[in-house]
From Swiss-Prot:
Task of the protein: May be involved in transcriptional regulation.
Species the sequence originates in: Mus musculus
Keyword Cell membrane: no
Taxonomic classification: Eukaryota, Metazoa, Chordata, Craniata, Vertebrata
UniProt KW Aminoacyl-tRNA synthetase keyword: no
Protein name, as recorded: Zinc finger and BTB domain-containing protein 9
Residue span of region Disordered: 178-200, 212-274, 293-356
């Protein structure tokens, strides 16, 4: 056998090749050590690829870390990968630097009065875990009385937990222990003093977390809150300054002084059956331009059944118009024309008044919901409008050539055929148009080409 000839591969048997064994290696503190190294690089200015300008202060960071921690930075860097980012002026530099430290280290130590600023910045950066945790801290402090205790809870520390995947609160060594969040759900907010630094700070904190608390109060309101009239109770505390404290959603028991001053509820009064008649007006824009006020007609149910007459009341409370004198306003039809009745009507003395009427209450059984002031009712609105126009000889459709007016649109269409020979004719091709705008458009496009009887061609 030649030495250059390759040897055939040896046949492998299942007995010679055992199944491969896998080894699982885990480092529990790898993420924390990695964050610590990244934070050290940030502080030393190593491998930083973005500069953040906040109120004239420049901070260096890593794009990958910012994009992973904040959806705001993720979208901003995705749209424009710029080496320098300028944040809005509403973001405080100290609060942003604290949140940047929280992103890299997973913990944050801050004074209590700086918590609203950090909450505002976290909301702007869309760091919702931090927003939720800060809101929970504020609720726990309010429940435990840590805010109104004269500044005893002066500092807080936010740390991250790998087990829960969020943020948790750790009290300072000189801070009173706070109650768990589970106990705050069934507890009632205590009253705080009306003056002092504690109440002012509480008002500031309540304003900053107003958006977050509204969502939770909306979900908890159907469980605890009962429908009550809006009133300011004497037992609810008010913060000093121009920022009032929001009242708690939980119902509170009124005090003895309050119960003595509050009037007892009035007995229920049976509402009278009144049908509201609202006049419809097509040309409402012209009415508003003229400065006219909206008129409201009220149709009493009892009078309509017994006497079948209408009483017109002014919406401003001017009183009821008498039948002998002229009313202070004139009823109008769909097109803004004055409705004439009595001696001035086109039909002579005693002619019924016409106008669109909107019936309130339950719809009639026959389905005729569109009524006229004369008493007739129609199933569809066009028939009611046609009835009013024909009764008053309204002619809203006018001819633009001879200034004749017609009651219905198809009458105007038939009338336009009489002007077929006198309409606009193209001097180049001889084509005639009824509308001047169409004629002008055609004249600009026509180049003298003839128009055959079987085909029209546009250029």
């Amino acid at each position: 056998m030649d030495a250059s000839t390759p040897l055939p591969p040896a046949s492998s048997s299942p007995r010679c090749n055992p199944a491969p064994q896998t080894i699982h290696i885990e480092f529990p503190h790898h993420s924390s050590s990695l964050l610590e190294s990244l934070n050290r690089h940030r502080l030393e200015g190593k491998f930083c690829d973005v500069s953040l300008l906040v109120q004239g202060r420049e901070l260096r960071a890593h794009k990958a870390v910012l994009a992973a921690a904040s959806p705001y930075f993720h979208d901003k860097l995705l749209l424009g990968d710029a080496p320098r980012l300028t944040l809005p002026n509403v973001i405080e530099a100290d609060a942003f630097e604290g949140l940047l430290q929280l992103i890299y280290s997973g913990s944050l130590h801050l004074p209590l009065d700086a918590l609203p600023a950090h909450l505002l910045v976290a909301s702007g950066l869309q760091m919702w875990q931090v927003v939720d945790r800060c809101s929970e801290i504020l609720r726990e402090l309010e429940t435990s009385g840590g805010i109104s205790a004269g500044g005893r809870a002066s500092s807080l520390t936010l740390i991250s937990t790998t087990s829960s995947g969020g943020w948790c609160i750790r009290s300072s060594p000189f801070q009173n222990p706070v109650r768990s969040s589970a106990s705050t759900e069934n507890s009632v907010l205590p009253e705080s003093p009306a003056g002092g630094e504690g109440s002012e700070l509480e008002g500031m904190l309540q304003i900053q977390v107003k958006v977050e608390e509204e969502e939770e109060q909306g979900s908890a309101a159907p469980l605890f809150q009962t429908p009550q009239p809006e009133r300011v109770s004497g037992g609810v505390s008010q913060a000093c300054g121009s920022h009032p404290l929001p009242t708690p959603a939980l119902p509170s028991k009124p005090s003895e002084d309050e119960s003595s001053t509050v009037d007892p509820p009035a007995p229920p009064v049976q509402a009278s059956q009144i049908l509201y008649v609202n006049q419809e007006n097509v040309e409402c824009k012209e009415e508003i331009a003229r400065g006219t006020k909206e008129k409201t007609k009220v149709l009493s149910g009892e009078d309509s059944e017994e006497k079948e007459e209408l009483r017109y009341l002014l919406s401003s409370g001017g009183g009821e118009s008498s039948g002998a004198g002229d009313p202070s306003w004139k009823p109008v039809d769909l097109h803004g024309n004055e409705i004439l009745s009595g001696d001035g009507g086109p039909g002579g003395t005693g002619q019924a008044m016409h106008g669109p009427v909107k019936l309130g209450g339950t719809p009639p059984a026959d389905g005729k919901c569109f009524a006229c002031l004369c008493g007739k009712r129609f199933a569809v609105k066009p028939k009611r409008d046609r009835h009013i126009m024909l009764t008053f000889s309204l002619r809203p459709f006018g001819c633009g050539i001879c200034n004749k007016r017609f009651k219905l649109k198809h009458h105007l269409t038939e009338h336009m055929k009489t002007h077929a020979r006198a309409l606009h004719a193209c001097p180049h091709c001889g084509r005639r148009f009824r509308v001047q705008a169409f004629f002008l458009r055609h004249r600009d496009l026509c180049k003298g080409q003839g128009w055959p009887t079987y085909h029209w061609t546009y250029k």
